[in-house]
From Swiss-Prot:
It comes from the Bacteria. Gene3D superfamilies: BH2638-like. It comes from Bacillus cereus (strain B4264). This is UPF0223 protein BCB4264_A4064. Pfam families: UPF0223.
Length: 89
């Protein structure tokens, strides 16, 4: 699938790399599954970069429009899964 991730050009290079890894983790949760701790670790880093709930919702909406994958649903599923288990949507 070819599409552009929602990125804010005010983010540093390191933050952009982190965000791309986070988007890839969400894709992985939908496509193959991902270990809960890996996804939640990237989500914690995502929240450091995007602390605002409104901005998080905006990014989720933009990402869902281009990819079809919901960040919100993936994180909700991860919160329901036991530690060291696979998050698969």
């Amino acid at each position: 699938m070819e599409y552009q991730y929602p990125l804010d050009y005010d983010w540093s290079n390191e933050e952009m790399v982190t965000m791309v890894k986070f988007y890839e983790a969400i894709e992985k949760a939908y496509e193959k599954g991902i270990i809960r701790e890996e996804l939640m670790g990237l989500y914690r880093r995502f929240k450091e970069i995007v602390p605002s709930k409104a901005e998080e919702k905006k990014i989720d909406k933009e990402f869902q429009e281009v990819s079809g994958y919901s960040i919100y649903r993936a994180i909700q599923r991860a919160k329901e899964v036991e530690e060291q288990k696979l998050v698969k949507i």
